[in-house]
Design a protein with these regions (language model features):
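Amphipathic alpha-helical segments that line or abut small-molecule/effector binding pockets
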Residues: 78-97, 144, 148, 152, ...
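An amphipathic alpha-helix adjacent to DNA-recognition modules
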Residues: 10-18, 22, 27-28, 36-39, ...
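Hydrophobic alpha-helical segments that form the core
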Residues: 137-159, 164-180
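Amphipathic alpha-helical packing segments from all-alpha helical-bundle domains
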Residues: 107-132, 137-152, 182
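Short glycine/proline-centered loop/turn elements that form peptide/ligand docking sites
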Residues: 25-32, 39, 52, 131-138, ...
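N-terminal intrinsically disordered/low-complexity leader segments
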Residues: 1-7, 185-189
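Short, hydrophobic secondary-structure boundary micro-motifs
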Residues: 29-30, 100-102, 111, 166
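Basic/polar phosphate-binding segments, predominantly the helix-turn-helix DNA-binding elements
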Residues: 2-6, 12, 34-56, 91-94, ...
Length: 189
């Protein structure tokens, strides 16, 4: 059971960092500045995190966990990749404001870290049952290709002001991913 005070403090720190990321690059944000924005002292900050980057990683991890949670709910059988990709896209859109603030001045915070590794593992588990090969190295690179492409497309969408509808973007992403996987998909029995 997690102490509610800890949850509130960590949430406050993360929200304060998101607000600061809307103003400047993550590399320019200090612990002191973040603590002041969160209205806590540095000692309290260090009770929860070691660095500003740790907070960024925690934010990304929360977003990816939300994405994966949506995708898991979309397909209880775990074998409908299209549904899972649609729900991943939906979750990204639901986190749009938060992601926009982060991407505004610090686009480099996406595409690396434990959150992306979590997303890669999830995608690998999702596509493994429908693929027609057992080559682990090839699977690793295929997952890297799919996740990197997925992230890049959504980052570009955000950078271009979300001009296309989220539905059109989700359809395009599904088409790209399924096209990339089509050669490897096991025929249905």
């Amino acid at each position: 059971v997690t102490d509610l005070r800890i949850v509130k403090t960590r949430t406050n720190i993360k929200n304060s960092l998101i607000d600061l990321l809307a103003e400047k690059n993550v590399s320019k944000i200090t612990v002191t500045e973040l603590a002041e924005k969160a209205m806590i002292n540095r000692k309290t900050f260090y009770r929860h995190y070691h660095t500003v980057q740790d907070v960024v990683d925690d934010i990304n991890y929360d977003i990816v966990n939300d994405v994966i949670s949506h995708a898991k709910k979309s397909d209880r059988d775990g074998n409908n990749l299209v549904n899972q990709l649609n729900f991943i896209g939906l979750s990204i859109v639901e986190n749009k404001e938060q992601i926009n603030k982060i991407l505004k001045n610090s686009p480099e915070v996406f595409g690396s870290g434990r959150s992306v590794e979590l997303l890669k593992r999830f995608i690998e588990v999702s596509i493994r049952p429908v693929l027609n090969f057992k080559n682990e190295t090839k699977l690793k690179y295929l997952v890297e290709f799919v996740v990197s492409g997925f992230i890049s497309v959504y980052v570009r969408w955000f950078n271009e002001g979300c001009a296309e509808s989220s539905e059109k973007l989700a359809d395009a992403v599904n088409e790209f991913v399924l096209g990339a996987l089509s050669e490897y998909v096991r025929p249905k029995s």
